[in-house]
A protein has these predicted regions:
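Auxiliary alpha/beta "docking" domains used to position bulky ligands
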Residues: 1-164, 202-203, 218-243
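Iron-sulfur cluster-binding cysteine motifs and their immediate structural context
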Residues: 167-192, 198-243
Length: 243
């Protein structure tokens, strides 16, 4: 391992952390399993040898509080803040290296599979991915292609916390019956219940709140309401388009 590049990654991690990004991963797509590489080829995303995929993620309330305090005047404030920070990172630490944006962006890249490849997460019964320490209270905020051989970060290693969770309170707290098995989340049942009149899951997920993993990182009520309202609007738009 190149110690210079490794120490540079440490500096980048520290720089990002104080700006609200606790998760940072650099991956070489040439080392990915073939199905993941194929998913990018299907999307006509070219990843030449030597390029890197970089992921930035947030945990808990830190990023939210920074954006609410200093950047809430922007439309799409979290995405815009994430883009701003990556551009600063590119100039300060990567010598203005050319980058390509994958997320935020219009292309439906497999974000969950990227997070799993980085070792950040595992599938859960909730349809969301789950981090072994932070539970479901994390999010991937940026995915970029960097045309520079940055040293890859070590892949996080962990077991799914769902495997050792015996009670699985997420099941009993789901009023729609959508939470049954990791391989069979009831997406349609969940969406239909959220859209129902007087649904108590419209802006939040009762099963998610019942999960015992990472409770110290639980989003604030205001944060939950904000993200819940956005996803509910998307659900309503999808239903109207289908009708």
């Amino acid at each position: 391992m190149d110690e210079t590049n490794d120490s540079e990654n440490k500096r980048v991690e520290n720089w990002l952390r104080i700006r609200g990004f606790d998760l940072f991963a650099v991956m070489d797509p040439a080392r990915w399993p073939e199905p993941l590489r194929e998913s990018f080829r299907t999307l006509d995303i070219n990843l030449p040898m030597g390029t890197r995929i970089v992921l930035l993620g947030s945990v808990g309330r830190t990023l939210w509080e920074i954006v609410r305090r200093d950047h809430w005047q922007d439309s799409d404030p979290i995405d815009r803040y994430s883009i701003r920070i990556v551009e600063e990172l590119r100039k300060l630490h990567w010598h203005g290296q050319k980058i390509e944006w994958l997320h935020p962006g219009p292309c439906p890249i497999p974000i969950q599979r990227l997070c799993r490849q980085a070792g950040w997460s595992h599938p859960s019964l909730l349809g969301l991915d789950i981090h072994a320490q932070f539970g479901t209270w994390f999010a991937c905020r940026a995915v970029i292609v960097v045309s520079r051989s940055i040293e890859c970060t070590p892949r996080e290693s962990s077991r799914s916390p769902c495997e050792s969770c015996l009670e699985k309170p997420c099941r009993s707290h789901c009023p729609s019956g959508a939470v049954t098995d990791i391989e069979a989340f009831g997406l349609m049942a969940c969406g239909s219940y959220r859209l129902a009149k007087e649904s108590n899951c419209a802006h939040l997920c009762l099963s998610r709140l019942a999960c015992p993993i990472g409770t110290s990182q639980r989003y604030s009520d205001v944060q939950l309401d904000y993200h819940g309202a956005l996803s509910l609007t998307s659900l309503q738009a999808a239903r109207e388009q289908a009708e």
